[in-house]
Every structure is written in structure tokens, then in C-alpha cells.
């Protein structure tokens, strides 16, 4: 199946006929035949054939089979497979037939190829607008504006929006929230570590669509921006940079000078990222921009720490932490990436020239003191032998009962190691049933050491070297070099037993790729178990809703198993812990002991607390060198940005926030911590709703990675970029030279022609259209490019409509019906109010797929139906008809641009500003215009149904014209003895003609006897038939055979439906909807059979 689909050229895309109207489908729904057919051969693929073709998945090329039968019951796998094979044959046959027909007819034209039409180059658009001023709108007749160019359309508007303050919250005259309510979102602060990626663009697209929508609904709206200092991430990037540039470490600079270097980095990349955000159209209130290391937010961080420390929630303890040797700091569990290996595997480790072996279980023997026995144990980390302080066996294991209480001899150190019994630490059935215990380097062993009061011996320095505890022969050796040497010496001592493959999980640092070492370190911890209970309760009680439900379930699971949080980091960039060690004169005290630490918002406060604690002692204070985990300051974001701990107006107005929108991957890093700290420090939830969006992957479903070369810079999608330039960007990052070549190959596979210019509006719309509530988004750049073409549709339609309205057109002061509307106007206004209702409801439910597809569909109704149909009204109608058609056209453009504004802010502003304005319009920008809502007077179902009949007649007439290859001067007859249908068709003859290019007139009759001989028939419904005069156009025998085939197919379909209806238990098991659908289908099929039989008789008479 894929073979012939994948060999296709992209020379054309069919426009399919919908059941109601002709339209272009979104790129994701296009059925593209890409076989080696020329553009001239397209017409030989008949529309009737297309109607019968099965749908195909545009990405995989696989046929899509409906898994349900007509009565709603599921098909069996065998039935599905049979139907699939049949569909594939049909597709192959259709493609062959189209090519065959084309080859037979276009031979002559191929001998005389037409000259290619020379396309005049479009001159470059030069925007002369002064930054911050309202954009100078050049006439659309200007050659530079002939075609849609996103760069032209999107220029100047953002600076004007900022200058005019349209993004700032709007209050009533007395400074209160507007009656419509408040809507506010705290934007997740991006790290100041380089550049935004497409995931940031998705976040902004979703958030800003909701912000703009609610602003247009009249609410007091705040979209609060800011940036995160990103401690580990930023420091590690700057360290890499200064090493690559100057061959210096941070220690060469010293703390103060190095932090100065990081601030320089921050200033440069902060402005770069801010520019990217503005290019994305985010309607942030920049007057409230926040930064986690600003003096204001630092005050909030210090306040939070001191309060929690004084309450005992923050405490000092020496525990195992995840130590990154490369970064020389502890990292949280959430910053650890686990790599699973099945067996012996070689991995690259920072600081080692050769790869290191993992996935191996090494067995060796400990000599039992006082006997010739040896106790065999197994380990994946032989180098930790120097930290062993016990060997544990199960108390019920008969093999070792005689060894209870005895000792073994360490092979490299003069250390006697006790043999202990422990039910929790030992599984008798696993391995030898004897386990080495290394309390200072393994979490399970740590717990065992606590139970048995064992010695905790740390064998590693912060740099991952063996320390003095290992003896002079080993001290200073790298940990993984020591692993090899330990095995060698065990062999020399005849204590080595063997190795075997071992499936295992290896913890790595997500920032550096280093192998994590569990190290015993004194750190600051947050006790979370009690806070977690409150966080669970507010979600269960509905004070916070989490969408989707899968994320809510993960939230409960994580909080139900929460551990205390290590918040100190051995870094220089960040908030220095506001806690001080009390050095009492003449005394020595352990820094692990929390009794000798005081927290203070200032040194003066700390001195007062220390003096109160030790009133009769002389002391000095020394502030902790460590900084706080970045997620601690980020956890305060919803209230620190509003001025907490001060009782500001912003805190009173906007806290708690309406919602928090972010990726589900940082639900635990960030979202839960904001809830925990918000409840603890403010007594309130920080937001009322959490919406977790999907993660963006590439078109093949792979995670985006610099090394794969599939990371997408949103600016490259907006402006376009060549493949060579994509390659060049790889050299600007911190990728290893070996990774660069791999990434280049990945880029060539993903973007062989580079990335086309799509513009911000198309990218935003595509990202929102992708948001379906799933876990992942497989982003295809071609789909984004498809929405650029949609932008062109909007641009050209508005341009054409403005020409139709004329320069002197002035819309009525208020919107509404005049009473002079034609049927097509009533129909399109019904569609407008219907779409407005659907979109409002969808956005309120965060249903972005429904909202974007409904708006997309509505624009195509305007372009392909109303504008086409209104041409004759505006050109040839009476003065009243012309005025009504123009007023309706204005209503459509005004509302359609407003509907799409939250998703496409730039093109909607550009084209809306070109529309004439009602005298009552108060908004200077579409940003502040009112969002379209349901209007009951437009909800004319009867008129809508009547015009749907017109469109169905049009569809069937087009189908016949295409099938019989009649390209002009076609003669169409509509037959109906149903009074209402007859009147509709008669009244709308001009509409039908305007929608069908190949005919000059339509005749409407009441009886089939009025149809001339030589016509073929297509049934619209049981009461309406469309006839096309084919006499003189076709081979009669061939057409009789063709109609006979259709008749046989229709009869077969009728039999199938009747079998379903007459089947056992149908009346009791089939639902009402299925029964109604089957009855309607049967009625239509019967009418089709009668019409086809009449057509055959008619064609036979032509032969006489």
C-alpha cells in the first residue's frame, strides 16, 4: 500500500466534495494521490470515483477502516482485514485508471507542451512604520502585497500593542475588576540558558489563545511573564563556555567574578529569549515582568525559607543525595534520568577517555576470620568495597546460621567486617543469599545501616576520586578506574569468582550525562509528608482541577509516595541559603547539627536569633555557601510575582490565578511544589485549574534531541531556514564534534529541504490544532506549512471582499438582521452563530481541536460558498439585495477575524484594521474587540436546511459533470414534486449556477416526464433528483454499462441494509440513532435504484 503512495509526486491535491458543500480540507485530512500523474491528468480522476474511495492516513499511507458495522456493533478482525484488502485494491485500481485515462487522451497535448507562464517576482515590502506607532497600512494593490507574506503581515503590530498598553489588565473606572470577571495565567518562566524550543511555542500558543479569548470576552486579564535563573542549567552552560573559550574553570575566577560572568550571560540571553517570545505574539503584561533572582523575588525566597525553617519544615540532615561528580552538586530525584540496560553495556562517562562497562554482576569472596570458609557475595559496583561495613544474611537461612555473629576480613584494608542478620535486606532465593552492606553509598544499605547502627564510611571525594578511607594505594584514583583495579587484585588474591550479565537501571544526571553517585552529605531538606496531605485534599475537593485525568492520577500517586525534598545545591549561581552557622568561641561543633544554625532575612536578624539561643556565649556567624534548588524559588512563582509577602493589590486581585497551563512532564518538578508551598505559605491554592498539554515530538514520534538533529527553533518555522543554515546552527551550541555529525544526518532526514517559511500565525494555529489531550504531539512541518496556505486563504478572501465592498462602504451602526437577507445569507449567518457557540464552548472546555477545526471550517464556508454565491447578488442584484449582501459579507469578515484572533493574532489584526468600522465600535485594536457569541436571531435552522439542499444539489450536479467529463455548457435539471424542495430549488437557481462553473443554467421540474431524453440521474434524497443531459457527449453503450454497475452496487447495498434491519435482535439491540441512520440510508438507496433504472431506460431510448 505504502509503495505506490510513497512514489507519488506532490503535483496536486484533490479538492473533495463534502456532503454539504465544496471545500478544501485541512492538510491533515487531504487525500493526496502522489503517483506519477501530471497536473493535466487530474481531471481524469472522476469525482464519483473519489466519492467511493476509502479514506487514507496521510502519514502512514494505511487505509482507515471503520471498526463498527452499520448497526453500531463491532466488526470482527477477519471482517476488518477483508474490508482493508478490498479497499487497497480499489485504491490501486483507481490510480491506474486515472493514469490510463490520462495517457489515452493527453497524448496530443504532451507533444506540444505549453510554455511555462513567467511569474513576476514580488518586490520586497518595506515597512516604514516607526516602532511603537500604529502600522502604516499600505494599499493591498501595492505589488509587494499581491501575495500573502507572513513577514509583511506580522511586522509592527507587537510594538504598537505594547506601547498602547492593550496587554495590561483593564479595570473599571474605580479600579475594580470588570463585571465580566478576572482571568489570569502565570507564564511558566523559561530558563535563561539559550533559546526557546518548539515546546515553549506550544505553551505560549495555548496560553495566549486563552488569554486573548478571555480578554475579548471583556474580563480583567493578566498574563504575567518572567524568567527563571535556572541554577544548575545556567551555571553548567556558562562553565562549558568559559572552558571552551578561555580554558578556565569557575574556581579560576572565584565566586564573585564567576557569578558576574553568569549575569553577563543572563543579560544577553534574556533579551534574546524575550525577543523570541514577542515574535510568537504572546500578549504578556511586560510591565510586570519578573525574574527569580531579582531583589523583589529574592526577598520572597528568603521569607519563605525563614518561615519554613522556624517552623521546622526545613531542617538539616546528613543523608544520601544524588551527587553529580561533573557538576559537583547534589541534584533532585526529578533531575535523575534512569537508563535501563539488559546486559553488558559500554557507556560514555564525562571525565573518562574510554567507555565504562555496566550491566555486569561481579561475584567475589570474603574470607571468614577464624576458618577456611569464604562468603561469596555479588555486586554491580566493585569499587564500593572500601565502604563495606557489614555482610548481611537472612536469619532463617540454614546455610549461614553457623556464621551469625562472626567476622570477615576486608581484602584490601585492616578492617574486620561483621556478619549480620536482616530479613529486610536479604532475599534468600536471590544470588548467594549474602549481601554486602555499604551504608554511605546505597539507599537500601543506608536504611540497613541505620537499623543496625553500622559505621557510615564515605569513600569518595566530591570529584569522584577515592579518598583517604581507601588507603594510600587507592587514594586519588578515579572511581571507575578503581573498579577495574579492584577486580584485578581480587583475581590476584584468588577471591574473584566470576561475572555475568545483569539487567539493571543506571541513574544519570539529566544536565551533564554523568553517572550519579549516592553520597552522604549534610543538606537542607523540606519535610513534605504533611503538606502533601493538604495538596491531595484540595484536588479531591475540587478546589483545583487537573486536566487530563491521567495527569490527576499521576499527581495523587506521586504525592501519596512523596519523600522529603533536598533543597541545597553546591553551586554559586542561585539564591544563597539564608541560614547561618554559629561558631561559638572555644567550642567545636558539627555542621550537621541543626542546633547550631539559624535562619535570617538578614545578618542582623540571624545575630539576634543566635544571641537568644546562646545568650552567654561569644560567637561569629558564617552564612552557608550552598544555594537553593531552582525549583524552590519556582515553587513560589504564583505569589512571589504578585508581591508576596506584602499584601499588594495584585495579590488581592489575581491570587489565586485562574489556571496554570504547562507540559505534563513538569507536573512534579514544578506544579505540585507550587501547590505545596502555596497552601503552606498563603493558606490558599495558587491556581484553580491545571491544564497539562502534550509533549512535542518529531514527525516520526521521536523525542526532540540536539544530538538527533530534530530540535525545532520556533523562529526557524516562522522565518524559514535552509538545510545548510540548520547545519551551521549546530556549531553554535555545546555539542561534542562527534554529536554534530550525527545531528547533521538527523537534520537531513527530518528536513531535507530545510524548513519553509510558515509565519507565527500558521505555527500557533497548527500547535493548537494538534492539542487533543494526548500525551504526545508528532509535529509535521508540512502540516504547519498547510496552515500557512490557510492564512493565504484568509488574506486573499479579505482582500477580495474589501474590493467587493468598495471604498465608500460604511457598515450599519449595529449588527443584526435587516429582513432583506437572501437564503444564502440566512444560511451563512446561521453557520456564524453556530460556529461562535461551538468555539466559545470549546475554549471554555480547553478543547483546542474543536475550536480550531470549527473556525477553519467556517472560513472555508465564507470563501468557497458565500463569497462565490454573493458575487451575483453584489453585481447583478437590486440595490436592496446588494446592500444586504454587502452587510452580511461585512458581518462575516468582522466576526471571522475576531473568531480566529486568539490563534492568529497578526493576520487578524492586519485585516481587521483594513475593514471599515461601525460608528459604535470602541476598540482601537482587535485585541480589545468583543469576541463573537451565539446570536439567537441568526439561528435559522429552516433556512439553513433549505440552503443545505441547494449545496447537496450542487454537489451531485458537479459529480455528474465530472463523471461525464462535461467541462462547459452543461445542462442540469432538478426534479422534485415536494412543494418545499421544488420552491427552494426554483428560487435558488442563480445560486446553483454561481456555484457550478460548467453550466449556464438550471431547470427545475416537478415530474420526471419533463426531463428530456438523453439524461443521467443522481439522487440527492428520496424527494429530489439531479439530471444531466449527456446526449451527444458520451458513448451510450458504455454509459449504460456504467449505470448498470451502479445499479448492481446500489441493489447490493439495499440488500445489506435490509439484512441488517431484519436480523435477529435488531429491534432490541440496535440503538435509536443506528435505526434512524439505517432507515434514512435505505430510503436514499431505494430512491437511487429507482433513478438509476429510469436512467438506463432513458439511455436505451437514445439508441432507438
From Swiss-Prot:
- Short sequence motif 'HIGH' region: positions: 190-200
Q: Where in the sequence is Phosphoserine found?
A: 73, 294, 332, 707
Phosphothreonine modified-residue sites: 1003
What UniProt keywords are attached to this protein's entry? Aminoacyl-tRNA synthetase, ATP-binding, Cytoplasm, Ligase, Mitochondrion, Nucleotide-binding, Phosphoprotein, Protein biosynthesis, Transit peptide
Question: Where does the record place the region Disordered?
Answer: 99-119
| Enzyme Commission numbers on file | 6.1.1.9
CDD domains for this protein: Anticodon_Ia_Val (cd07962), ValRS_core (cd00817)
* PANTHER family associated with the record: VALINE--TRNA LIGASE, VALYL-TRNA SYNTHETASES
Protein name (record): Valine--tRNA ligase, mitochondrial
Say which species the protein is native to.
Saccharomyces cerevisiae (strain ATCC 204508 / S288c) (Baker's yeast)
Per UniProt, what is the name of the gene that codes for the protein in this document? VAS1
Amino acid at each position: 500500500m505504502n509503495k505506490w503512495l510513497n512514489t507519488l509526486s506532490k503535483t496536486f491535491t484533490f479538492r473533495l466534495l463534502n456532503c454539504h458543500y465544496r471545500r478544501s480540507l485541512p492538510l491533515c485530512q487531504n487525500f493526496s494521490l502522489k503517483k506519477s500523474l501530471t497536473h493535466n491528468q487530474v481531471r481524469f480522476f472522476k469525482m464519483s470515483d473519489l466519492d467511493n474511495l476509502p479514506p487514507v492516513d496521510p502519514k502512514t499511507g494505511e487505509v482507515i477502516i471503520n471498526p463498527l458495522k452499520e448497526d453500531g456493533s463491532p466488526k470482527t478482525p477477519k471482517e476488518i482485514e477483508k474490508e482493508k484488502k478490498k479497499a487497497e485494491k480499489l485504491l490501486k485500481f483507481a490510480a491506474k485508471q486515472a493514469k490510463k485515462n490520462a495517457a489515452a487522451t493527453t497524448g496530443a497535448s504532451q507533444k506540444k507542451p505549453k510554455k511555462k507562464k513567467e511569474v513576476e517576482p514580488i518586490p520586497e515590502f518595506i515597512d516604514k512604520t516607526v516602532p511603537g506607532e500604529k502600522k502604516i497600512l499600505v494599499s493591498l494593490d501595492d505589488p509587494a502585497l499581491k501575495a500573502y507574506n507572513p513577514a509583511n503581515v506580522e511586522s509592527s503590530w507587537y510594538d504598537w500593542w505594547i506601547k498602547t498598553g492593550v496587554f495590561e489588565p483593564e479595570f473599571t473606572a474605580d479600579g475594580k475588576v470588570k463585571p465580566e470577571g478576572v482571568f489570569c495565567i502565570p507564564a511558566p518562566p523559561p530558563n535563561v540558558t539559550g533559546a526557546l524550543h518548539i515546546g515553549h511555542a506550544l505553551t505560549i500558543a495555548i496560553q495566549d489563545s486563552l488569554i486573548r479569548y478571555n480578554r475579548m470576552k471583556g474580563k480583567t486579564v493578566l498574563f504575567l511573564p518572567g524568567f527563571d535563573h535556572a541554577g544548575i542549567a545556567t551555571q553548567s552552560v556558562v562553565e562549558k563556555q568559559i572552558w571552551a573559550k578561555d580554558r578556565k574553570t569557575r574556581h579560576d575566577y572565584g565566586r564573585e567574578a564567576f557569578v558576574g560572568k553568569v549575569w553577563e550571560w543572563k543579560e544577553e540571553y534574556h533579551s534574546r529569549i524575550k525577543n523570541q517570545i514577542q515574535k510568537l505574539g504572546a500578549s504578556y503584561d511586560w510591565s510586570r515582568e519578573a525574574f527569580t533572582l531579582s531583589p523583589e523575588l529574592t526577598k520572597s525566597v528568603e521569607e519563605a525559607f525563614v518561615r519554613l525553617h522556624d517552623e521546622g519544615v526545613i531542617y538539616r540532615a546528613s543523608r544520601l543525595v544524588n551527587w553529580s561528580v561533573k557538576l559537583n552538586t547534589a541534584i533532585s530525584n526529578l533531575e535523575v534520568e534512569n537508563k535501563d540496560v539488559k546486559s553488558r553495556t559500554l557507556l560514555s562517562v564525562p571525565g573518562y577517555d574510554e567507555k565504562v562497562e555496566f550491566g555486569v554482576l561481579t561475584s567475589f569472596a570474603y574470607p571468614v576470620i577464624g576458618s577456611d570458609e569464604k562468603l561469596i557475595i555479588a555486586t554491580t559496583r566493585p569499587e564500593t568495597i572500601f565502604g563495606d561495613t557489614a555482610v548481611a544474611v537472612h536469619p532463617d537461612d540454614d546455610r549461614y546460621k553457623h556464621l551469625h555473629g562472626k567476622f570477615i576480613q576486608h581484602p584490601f584494608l585492616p578492617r574486620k567486617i561483621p556478619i549480620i542478620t536482616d530479613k529486610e535486606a536479604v532475599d534468600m532465593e536471590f544470588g548467594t543469599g549474602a549481601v554486602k552492606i555499604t551504608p554511605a553509598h546505597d539507599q537500601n544499605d543506608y536504611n540497613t545501616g541505620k537499623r543496625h547502627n553500622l559505621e557510615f564510611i564515605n569513600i569518595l571525594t566530591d570529584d569522584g576520586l577515592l579518598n583517604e578511607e581507601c588507603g594510600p594505594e587507592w587514594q586519588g584514583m578515579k572511581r571507575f578506574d578503581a573498579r577495574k583495579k579492584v577486580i584485578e587484585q581480587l583475581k590476584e588474591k584468588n577471591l574473584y569468582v566470576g561475572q555475568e550479565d545483569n539487567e539493571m537501571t543506571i541513574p544519570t544526571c539529566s544536565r551533564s550525562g554523568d553517572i550519579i553517585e549516592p553520597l552522604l552529605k549534610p543538606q537542607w531538606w523540606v519535610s513534605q509528608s504533611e503538606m502533601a496531605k493538604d495538596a491531595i485534599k484540595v484536588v479531591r475537593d475540587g478546589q483545583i482541577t487537573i486536566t487530563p485525568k491521567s495527569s490527576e492520577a499521576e499527581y495523587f500517586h506521586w504525592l501519596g509516595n512523596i519523600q522529603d525534598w533536598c533543597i541545597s545545591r553546591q553551586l554559586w549561581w542561585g539564591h544563597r541559603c539564608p541560614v547561618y552557622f554559629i561558631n561559638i568561641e572555644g567550642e567545636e561543633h558539627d555542621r550537621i547539627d541543626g542546633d547550631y544554625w539559624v535562619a535570617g532575612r538578614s545578618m542582623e536578624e540571624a545575630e539576634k536569633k543566635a544571641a537568644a539561643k546562646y545568650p552567654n556565649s561569644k560567637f561569629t556567624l558564617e552564612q552557608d555557601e550552598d544555594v537553593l534548588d531552582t525549583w524552590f524559588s519556582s515553587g513560589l512563582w504564583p505569589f512571589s510575582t504578585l508581591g508576596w509577602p506584602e499584601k499588594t493589590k495584585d495579590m488581592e486581585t489575581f491570587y489565586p490565578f485562574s489556571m496554570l497551563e504547562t507540559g505534563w512532564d513538569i507536573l512534579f518538578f514544578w506544579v505540585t511544589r507550587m501547590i505545596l508551598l502555596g497552601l503552606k505559605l498563603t493558606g490558599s491554592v495558587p491556581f484553580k485549574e491545571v491544564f497539562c498539554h502534550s509533549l512535542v515530538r518529531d514527525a516520526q514520534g521521536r523525542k526532540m534531541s540536539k544530538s538527533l538533529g530534530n530540535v525545532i527553533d520556533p523562529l526557524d518555522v516562522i522565518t524559514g531556514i535552509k538545510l545548510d543554515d540548520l547545519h551551521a546552527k549546530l556549531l553554535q551550541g555545546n555539542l561534542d564534534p562527534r554529536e554534530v555529525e550525527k545531528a547533521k544526518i538527523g537534520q537531513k532526514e527530518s528536513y531535507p529541504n530545510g524548513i519553509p517559511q510558515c509565519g507565527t500565525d500558521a505555527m500557533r494555529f497548527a500547535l493548537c490544532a494538534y492539542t487533543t489531550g494526548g500525551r504526545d504531539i508528532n509535529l509535521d512541518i508540512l502540516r504547519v506549512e498547510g496552515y500557512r496556505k490557510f492564512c493565504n486563504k484568509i488574506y486573499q478572501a479579505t482582500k477580495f471582499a474589501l474590493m467587493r465592498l468598495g471604498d465608500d462602504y460604511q457598515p450599519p451602526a449595529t449588527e443584526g438582521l435587516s429582513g432583506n437577507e437572501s437564503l444564502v445569507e440566512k444560511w451563512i449567518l446561521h453557520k456564524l452563530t453556530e460556529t461562535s457557540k461551538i468555539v466559545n464552548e470549546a475554549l471554555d472546555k480547553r478543547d483546542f481541536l474543536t475550536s480550531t477545526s470549527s473556525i477553519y471550517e467556517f472560513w472555508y464556508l465564507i470563501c468557497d460558498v458565500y463569497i462565490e454565491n454573493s458575487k451575483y447578488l453584489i453585481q447583478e442584484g437590486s440595490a436592496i439585495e446588494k446592500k444586504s449582501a454587502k452587510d452580511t459579507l461585512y458581518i462575516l469578515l468582522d466576526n471571522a477575524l475576531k473568531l480566529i484572533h486568539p490563534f492568529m493574532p497578526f493576520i487578524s489584526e492586519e485585516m481587521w484594521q483594513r475593514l471599515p468600522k461601525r460608528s459604535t465600535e470602541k476598540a482601537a485594536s482587535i485585541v480589545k474587540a468583543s469576541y463573537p457569541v451565539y446570536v439567537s436571531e441568526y439561528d435559522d435552522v429552516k433556512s439553513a436546511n433549505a440552503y443545505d439542499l441547494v449545496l447537496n444539489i450542487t454537489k451531485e450536479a458537479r459529480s455528474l459533470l465530472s463523471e461525464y467529463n462535461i467541462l462547459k455548457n452543461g445542462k442540469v435539471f432538478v426534479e422534485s414534486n415536494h412543494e418545499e424542495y421544488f420552491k427552494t430549488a426554483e428560487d435558488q437557481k442563480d445560486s446553483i449556477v454561481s456555484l457550478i462553473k460548467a453550466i449556464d443554467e438550471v431547470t427545475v421540474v416537478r415530474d420526471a416526464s419533463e426531463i428530456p431524453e438523453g439524461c443521467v440521474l443522481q439522487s440527492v434524497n428520496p424527494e429530489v433528483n439531479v439530471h444531466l443531459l449527456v446526449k451527444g457527449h458520451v458513448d451510450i453503450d458504455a454509459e449504460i454499462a456504467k449505470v448498470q454497475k451502479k445499479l448492481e452496487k446500489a441493489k447490493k447495498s439495499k440488500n445489506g441494509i435490509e439484512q441488517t434491519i431484519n436480523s435477529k435482535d435488531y429491534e432490541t439491540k440496535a440503538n435509536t440513532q443506528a435505526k434512524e441512520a439505517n432507515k434514512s440510508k435505505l430510503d436514499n438507496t431505494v430512491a437511487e435504484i429507482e433513478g438509476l433504472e429510469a436512467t438506463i431506460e432513458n439511455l436505451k431510448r437514445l439508441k432507438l
